[in-house]
Curated annotation (Swiss-Prot):
Gene: CGA
Name of this protein: Glycoprotein hormones alpha chain
Quaternary structure annotation from Swiss-Prot or TrEMBL: Heterodimer. The active hormones thyrotropin, lutropin, follitropin and choriogonadotropin are heterodimers composed of CGA, a common alpha chain described here and a unique beta chain which confers their biological specificity to the hormones: TSHB for thyrotropin, LHB for lutropin, FSHB for follitropin and choriogonadotropin subunit beta/CGB for choriogonadotropin.
Gene Ontology MF terms in the entry: follicle-stimulating hormone activity
Recorded GO CC terms: extracellular space; follicle-stimulating hormone complex
Compartments where found: Secreted
Disulfide-bonded cysteines: C35-C59, C38-C88, C56-C110, C60-C112, C87-C115
Keyword Signal: yes
Positions bearing carbohydrate: N80, N106
Gene Ontology biological-process entries: G protein-coupled receptor signaling pathway; positive regulation of steroid biosynthetic process; regulation of signaling receptor activity; thyroid hormone generation
Amino acid sequence: MDSYRKYAAVILVTLLVFLHSLHSVPDGDFTAQECPECKLKENKYFSKLGAPVYQCAGCCFSRAYPTPVRSQKTMSVPKNVTSESSCCVAKTYTKATVMGNIKVENHTECHCSTCYHHKF
């Protein structure tokens, strides 16, 4: 009879630990991160009264998956994981002059597309 009480106690403690850990996690999806959607955001540094300057900001997607063997054979330096991502970039923009003579892009529409920060 004592062995049943020990098993019941172990099960009860395990259940309580599980419930405690479940309630300690914030509400929402486990994979969701605090990153807003891709949209226009005012650039406070370059904006002036009456002439706001906007830039695209926010999250798109990224993923990683195993590189197919057929593709690895064609690589000069084979890698096991292939990653793919898209960035929040300007779909349309206009040129604007701020602070006298500094030319910047004033974004007018955003979308998720190829990341350009590494393509100089």
